From Swiss-Prot:
Region Disordered: start-end pairs: 16-40
Organism: Schizosaccharomyces pombe (strain 972 / ATCC 24843)
Bias (Polar residues) ranges: 20-31
The name this protein goes by in its record: Uncharacterized protein C29A10.17
Any Gene Ontology biological process: regulation of TORC1 signaling
GO CC terms in record: fungal-type vacuole membrane; Ragulator complex
Top-level taxonomic group: Eukaryota
Amino acid sequence: MGNCCSFLFNNSDDIDEQTPLLNNDGIQRTPPSAEADMSLRKREEEEEWESKVYDVAKNKFIDVFSLRLRTEAPQRDPRDNIYEEVLDQIDSLNLDPKYDVAKPTEQETEFIIRKLGVLIDDINNIKLSDKEIKGKMVINLSKVQPNITGSPS
């Protein structure tokens, strides 16, 4: 290992090899300031809290949209099962033509009307969030014509 400035001081590389690095025995290290100590403690507390959150999150549900930890399973709306119920009802229908029964029973009619009403309400209540695209330009790329002439004038 040579000293890059040895030619300026007329020192040879041998001197650099023989000179050990200075030790820190006589230098007293200053303890961390109270502010640095508090920030270190805060970071340790944050890391501990994060590890607890991750541990709890393994067994709990996380609301990914708000990124808040849920402490219990989300409550399901009873209307959430309507699609499965309708499919079960459709699967259980006997589609063989029966000439003696032309209309569904009153109970079946009420059930179908109620479920279709809930389905229509759900469709009408769907609102798209524009938070993701607010302030961004949305372009249909199939309608964009390339500019062959170069830079716009």
